[in-house]
Each structure stands twice: as structure tokens, then as C-alpha cells.
């Protein structure tokens, strides 16, 4: 299909003089799909695979040239637990499939022997079902998996606008090396951007993370004395930070271009300093990989039909679409309500990953890889089934998820 539609788009650019430029742009619609997934992190990978396995024609749009998001390009390479810390696995389906894929050819650290080898049930109470994986191997294997499942991947592509037909997204406007084009959406859109970018562009209600983000500068190095090692410079999150981990008192929203550029430069400075300090002790020490995206954790999320809080562990929800644990402690298990994945404003938009509808206190629990994968599978499956998420019979969705190995309730 190749057709053209004239879209009148106004852009305001505010330099020092506060001038504005009004542009009238004719944007060609060059492609179409049933389900468009925006963002190729763990949530986007899960959503695209699940939608395609349900028979949908799926296009995944990713701004970088590598899949995995923070879990690869961001060097946050710890697949946090699929278990409750008490010896019981709670997250299944694609969450477990991607876990096993990440270490198909070996783990870097924390290999969960008790979970991957038989006869270790007692040891599972002492060892969590988590692992440190190689980011490059995972990115390559994930790409292969998506292609095998018939997903079309557009790398180097940013979503810059949407076209609406009433309360539904009819086309997604993208920019890449081909210029500015539109992709017609025949059914639904899954926002896996991590920042609720599609929700924001489409006019859906969103909320920002009030505490903002701290600076991290994780990177990989190799040396004769230590071999390959992950340097977790700076605190990874506010929940477990120690005073000595805090690199700067400045906090970052993750939603401002200038701020993100400054944050990246600060992170690079700390990485370089860490490298040079290590080289003083071992001249063979050299960097292997540094993050190519900002190591931002929590920014903006949708204001969904329902918002879940961290106090609701072990609570049963009639619209549960999966289970996940609190990676920070042993015991708590949560059901994921389907109503946290979509809002009231845009009928055919659903979210997965760290931009689902949760309180600030809950955000640190739900932003991690297992929850991204669980929510991604639910969102992608639903996206293949409907163009109006509020009207989708939850029993129909739950039947498909259960058939695919997802556990809905404790």
C-alpha cells in the first residue's frame, strides 16, 4: 500500500527571541500494520512477539539500532527475579522465555543453578531466580526471535506525532533516514517507550515521577586481573542507594532534551574517572562497553483506569494478567491488573513496561525487566485482539494468556 494524506501539523520552536515557526506538512502514508509497538526494550519485545503469535501484522519501531533498551544499550544487564524469594516462581510465559534466551549461551554472573537444574527445590529458597546476562548476545538473539515470529523492525526510527480519528490513533508519524512518513494503524498501538511518549502525543492523561532520577554510570571493562566486569558506578535506584553511591545531588526528570544531554556528559565524566582510577592499579584495564542511552529509570507514565500501589501485595484482581514479585525483598507478590495498562482517553492505545499506571512508590518495583515482560505479553496479546481495550472481555484475554503459560493468580 502506498498513499498520501495531508496532515496539518504546527510546530513551535522557541529560541531566545521566543519566535515561532508554523509548518504545513504533507506526510505520506508509506506503510500500514495491524499492531504498532513503539519501543524495542523488553516490554516492546514481549508485546511484539505476543501480538504476532496471535496472528497480528506487527511493526516494531525503535529509535536506536539495537533491541533491549536499558537492558542492553543502557548496560543495566541484570534480569531481576522471576520468583518471590521464598522458593516459588511467579512470572512465567514470555518473561521466562526471554530470561532463558538471555543466557542461552552462558551467563555473566548469578547463574541460577537451583532454578535451571532439577532436584534443587530447597536451594530455591536461598537463591533467587535472577541472572546477569551479556547484553550483546541478548540483543542479537532477541532480534532473531522477532524476525522468526514475523515482526517487522524499523530501527533508527522515532515517533514524533500521531494522527487521530476520534478517540483512536489512525496513524503514527515517524522520522528516520527516509524522512517524515506515516504508518497507518489498522487496530492498535502499544506504547513501550518507557516514557509514555505515545500517550503524551495522543493526548492521553499522563503523570510524571515526582522524586526524579539519580545519576548512574554503569559500564563494562576487561582486565587481566578481573576479566570482564560490570562496574555499577552510582546508585541504581532510590530504594537501595547508599550515601557513597550518590554521584551528584542533582536529580533528573528524563523528559528534557538539554537535561538529558547534560546528564549523559556527567555520566561519561564519572565513567572516564573510574576507568583511569582502575588503570592506575592495572594498566591492562580497558573499557569494553559504555551506555549509549541515558540510564534513566522512571519518568512519565499513563494515568490508567486503575493505579496500583506497593501496599497491594497478595491482593487478588479479577482482571489480573500476570504475576510479579518485589525484586528488592523476599515475599511480596503482586497481580497485574489489566486496567493499569490503558486509560480512558485513547481507545486503541495500551502501555507496557515502566510507563504503566502505578504510584510513585510502586514504580521502582514495576520498572524492571520481569514486569516489563509480563506487562508486554499482556498488552501485545490484547492489542492483537481489539481496537478498544475497555470493551475487551477480560475472560477472553485471560484464556489466551493462561493457554500460553501465564499464571494469573497466586
Question: Predicted regions: what is each one?
Answer:
Residues 26, 70-72, 94, 98, ...:
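Flavin (FAD/FMN)-binding glycine-rich loop and adjacent Rossmann-like elements that form
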Residues 2-35:
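Extreme N-terminal leader/targeting segments of oxidoreductases
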Residues 29, 54, 64, 342-344:
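Extracellular/periplasmic catalytic domains that process cell-envelope and extracellular macromolecules
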Residues 29, 33, 43-44, 182:
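Ligand-binding pocket scaffold of soluble enzyme catalytic domains
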Residues 15-17, 24, 56-57, 63-161, ...:
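Conserved N-terminal/central alpha/beta ligand/cofactor-binding core
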Residues 38-40, 61-64, 192-194, 354-355:
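Active-site-proximal beta-strand/loop segments in catalytic clefts of secreted hydrolases
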Residues 35-56:
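N-terminal Rossmann-like FAD-binding beta1-loop-alpha1 element of flavoenzymes
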Amino acid at each position: 500500500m502506498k498513499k498520501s494524506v495531508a496532515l496539518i501539523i504546527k510546530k513551535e520552536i522557541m529560541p531566545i527571541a521566543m519566535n515561532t515557526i508554523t509548518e504545513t506538512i504533507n506526510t505520506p502514508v508509506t506503510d500500514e500494520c495491524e499492531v504498532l509497538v513503539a519501543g524495542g526494550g523488553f516490554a516492546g519485545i514481549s508485546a511484539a512477539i505476543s501480538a504476532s503469535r496471535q496472528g497480528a501484522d506487527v511493526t516494531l519501531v525503535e529509535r536506536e539500532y539495537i533491541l533491549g533498551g536499558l537492558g542492553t544499550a543502557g548496560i543495566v544487564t541484570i534480569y531481576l527475579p522471576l520468583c518471590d524469594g521464598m522458593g516459588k516462581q511467579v512470572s512465567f510465559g514470555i518473561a521466562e522465555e526471554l530470561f532463558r534466551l538471555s543466557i542461552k549461551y552462558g551467563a555473566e554472573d548469578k547463574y541460577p543453578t537451583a532454578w535451571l537444574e532439577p532436584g534443587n527445590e530447597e536451594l530455591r529458597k536461598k537463591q533467587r531466580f535472577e541472572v546477569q546476562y551479556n547484553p550483546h548476545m541478548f540483543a542479537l538473539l532477541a532480534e532473531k526471535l522477532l524476525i522468526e515470529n514475523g515482526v517487522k523492525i524499523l530501527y533508527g526510527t522515532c515517533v514524533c506525532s500521531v494522527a487521530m480519528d476520534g478517540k483512536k490513533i489512525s496513524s503514527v508519524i515517524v522520522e528516520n533516514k527516509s524522512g517524515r512518513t506515516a504508518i497507518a494503524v489498522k487496530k492498535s498501538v502499544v506504547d513501550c517507550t518507557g516514557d509514555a511518549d505515545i500517550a503524551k502525543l495522543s493526548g492521553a492523561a499522563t503523570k510524571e515521577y515526582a522524586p526524579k532520577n539519580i545519576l548512574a554510570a554503569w559500564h563494562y571493562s576487561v582486565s587481566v586481573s578481573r576479566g570482564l566486569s560490570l562496574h555499577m558506578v552510582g546508585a541504581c535506584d532510590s530504594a537501595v542507594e547508599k550515601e557513597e553511591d550518590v554521584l551528584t545531588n542533582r536529580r533528573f526528570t528524563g523528559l528534557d532534551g538539554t537535561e538529558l544531554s547534560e546528564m549523559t556528559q556527567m555520566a561519561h565524566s564519572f565513567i572516564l574517572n573510574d576507568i583511569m582510577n582502575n588503570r592506575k592499579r592495572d594498566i591492562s584495564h580497558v573499557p569494553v562497553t559504555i551506555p549509549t542511552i541515558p540510564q534513566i529509570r522512571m519518568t512519565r507514565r499513563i494515568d490508567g483506569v486503575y493505579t496500583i500501589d506497593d501496599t497491594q501485595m497478595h491482593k487478588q484482581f479479577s482482571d489480573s494478567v500476570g504475576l510479579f514479585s518485589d525484586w528488592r525483598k523476599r515475599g511480596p507478590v503482586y497481580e497485574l491488573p489489566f486496567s493499569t495498562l490503558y486509560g480512558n482517553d485513547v481507545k486503541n492505545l495500551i502501555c507496557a513496561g515502566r510507563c504503566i499506571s502505578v504510584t510513585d512508590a510502586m514504580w521502582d518495583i514495576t520498572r524492571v525487566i520481569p514486569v516489563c515482560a509480563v506487562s508486554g505479553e499482556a498488552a501485545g496479546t490484547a492489542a492483537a485482539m481489539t481496537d478498544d481495550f475497555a470493551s475487551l472481555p477480560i475472560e477472553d484475554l485471560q484464556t489466551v494468556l493462561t493457554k500460553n503459560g501465564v499464571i494469573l493468580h497466586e
